[in-house]
Amino acid sequence: MSKSAVGKVLKLFTSKSGTSQRFEQKRLSLDNFGVLDDKFYNKNTERSVLVSSIDSYKLIQTYGIDMPFGYLGENILMDFNPYNLDMGSRIQIGTTIIEISQYCTICNHLAVLDVKIPTLLKDDRGIFAKVKEAGEITLNDSVYII
């Protein structure tokens, strides 16, 4: 039985120590400790990858707020919304398999751009995942629920 893609990767980001800025990438390498070259690598493997949906950005835009991609702190931005998947659900992207480990909470730093953002994104910021199979993710890779 062949699997069908549910979406694709739109943007990839890493973060660096000493700054909250996100750096756009063309490819991410992941292992069991998280995203290589990311400041959160090997910090908390249960929360080593942050995945967000374009739907979060569209929601904020409906309120007239221009929020730049990467602002949610995501490593992976995709056009599929994984927020309603169960904990333990597995997602294959590129050669990597990740497992949903936690629903993302809202951080107060999101209010820096606009004070309404934390309230608007209460349940729609993203998901944390842990890496189950190391590999690479590139822009436009397909997303599969496995």
Could you say what each language-model-derived stretch is?
Residues Q21-E24, N108-D114:
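Short, solvent-exposed secondary-structure boundary/capping segments
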Residues Y103, A111, L139-S142:
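A short secondary-structure junction signal
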